[in-house]
Structures are given as C-alpha cells and as structure tokens.
C-alpha cells in the first residue's frame, strides 16, 4: 500500500496521528507576508483625528481605517486606481485570532460577491491582482481573508482555525457590508476548498465553486485510501453531500498536487453539483490560464444561477 512497510502500517493504524498533525504536515506553507496595513487618519474635530500608529503586522487588532501597503513580492499588476478599490480591515475569529480581510469592489452594483478562500503558499498581498482581474471579468466583487498564520493574521495554521477563520470572514462580510447569503458565492481553491466545503455544508448561499479540491488529507497522502478514518483531516468527501447550494467543481486532468480523481469523487458525491469543468492538460496552479476557466465561470454566474432562482 503506497510503498509502506508492515511496521509503518501498524504504526499508522494502531497509533494513528491526530487530524491536526496530518493537516500541518500536508497543507500549510504560509509565505513571508507580502503586505502590511497602514493606518488612515480618522475624520474628527477640525477635519483630523488620531489614527493607530505604525503599520499593522503582528500586533493585536486595533479599530480604525487601514490601507494596504504591498511589498515587491506581491507583484501587483495594476495601478493606483485599482489599488484604491481595495478595502482592508481586521476581524477576530471565535478562536481569538486576528484575521485580515480584503474587499475588492470590482463592479459597482454587482449582483454577487465572491467569498474567496485562497490556496496554500500565498497571502492576500499576492492574491489581490488576481482578485481585481477575476472580479472584473466575471462581474462580481471579491471578498477574501488570510488564514491564521498567513499574512498579518495571527495564530498558527490548523484545521480548526481554518473553520473559525472562514466563519469570521462570513460574519464580517454579512454584517459589515450587509450582504445576504443569497448574494454570496463561496469559492475555495486547493486547501481553500476545506473551509469552503465546511461553511457551505452549514449555510445556504448563492453558489459554491470548488477549484482543484481535495477529498481528504489521508487520500492526498495515501491515494489508495478508500474510507475516511477518524484521524483523517480535511474530510471534504464526508461533507460535500450536505451542501444545498449549486456546486461547480473545477479540476485539471494533469493535477500533480491533488489528483484529478479527487475532483471526480467529489462530483459523484455531491447531489447539488452542476456540469463540472475538467480542464484537459491543466495542472494544479495553471487552470486560470485556460480560456474555458473564465467561460465556465461566466456561464455559471450569469446564466445558470439566475435560471435556478426563477
């Protein structure tokens, strides 16, 4: 079985690791932060007010208005006009971690806002160019957040924190911007499909997009795994059937990180799945470069979702 010796198999099944250890070994590679939050002056008597001093990197969350400062490694592809459409703030999760959030106003009066849970080795600074481009092309605003231990979010990455982090983002999006669930599309990419599936299994929303999803942590590490063990991490395969919103699954047939079979298995298990997008020849990190990616998203959002609402 996957090249494991008898002694290794005995160790695995007689003294199984906890899900948190599996998750930490498989999933989390937070980069060095590519951004900080810089305070903006608050309006006050005489037209000026006190703002929090210094950039926000790792200190406790403070009230106030913030602007994002990107490092060169963020490689922002747009100009100041687009940067000014990005609003950033910090919220707190139920596990007491500070969670950095980003709201990108791509389209005035957009019908939908995408709550985007990004992939593994990136943070909000590296993703914001993609968010500007994606939102503009599919006609949606984009809301995203950094997981605990990513970017300027505090704490450390863990499976439990992933679930608390997306809960905090969901609540912030709903309360801060007054956006109702039927106007929110949950979008998860790679490891981001884990919090996305968990949230979507508990709350109804406009739709769900699973981009290069995994079935579970054990199935990534040991591809011959056929059942979900109690010590498995990220058990998307056990939760996807509970989603009551339309689900679009996208996967590359040559994915070298999370095998294409994961996307197929989730599609077969998901009763609310719509026509999937299997991108022939695409790997784990290049699906966005194929023309059918945007074409399928546009059709899903502009044609299929409205028809399901009528």
From Swiss-Prot:
It is a lipid-anchor. Keywords: Cell membrane, Cell projection, Endosome, Hydrolase, Lipoprotein, Membrane, Palmitate, Phosphoprotein, Postsynaptic cell membrane, Synapse. Residues 38-61 are annotated as: Disordered. Its EC number is 3.1.2.22. It is an enzyme of class 3 (hydrolase). One of its GO terms (molecular function) is palmitoyl-(protein) hydrolase activity. Expressed in brain (at protein level). Expressed in hippocampal neurons. Belongs to the AB hydrolase superfamily. ABHD17 family. It comes from the Eukaryota. It catalyses: S-hexadecanoyl-L-cysteinyl-[protein] + H2O = L-cysteinyl-[protein] + hexadecanoate + H(+). The lineage of its organism: Eukaryota, Metazoa, Chordata, Craniata, Vertebrata. The keyword Protein transport does not apply. The modification Phosphoserine is found at residue 307. Palmitoylated on cysteine residues located in a cysteine cluster at the N-terminus which promotes membrane localization. Palmitoylation is required for post-synaptic localization and for depalmitoylating activity towards DLG4/PSD95. This is Alpha/beta hydrolase domain-containing protein 17A. The keyword Membrane applies. Its main location: membrane. GO terms for biological process: negative regulation of NLRP3 inflammasome complex assembly; negative regulation of protein localization to microtubule; positive regulation of protein localization to endosome; protein depalmitoylation; protein localization to membrane; regulation of postsynapse organization. Hydrolyzes fatty acids from S-acylated cysteine residues in proteins. Has depalmitoylating activity towards NRAS. Has depalmitoylating activity towards DLG4/PSD95. May have depalmitoylating activity towards MAP6. Pfam families: Hydrolase_4. The active site is at 190 (charge relay system), 255 (charge relay system), 284 (charge relay system). It comes from Rattus norvegicus. PANTHER family: ALPHA/BETA HYDROLASE DOMAIN-CONTAINING PROTEIN, ALPHA_BETA HYDROLASE DOMAIN-CONTAINING PROTEIN 17A. GO terms for cellular component: dendritic spine; endosome membrane; glutamatergic synapse; nuclear speck; plasma membrane; postsynaptic density; postsynaptic density membrane; postsynaptic recycling endosome membrane. It is found in: Cell membrane; Recycling endosome membrane; Cell projection, Dendritic spine; Postsynaptic density membrane.
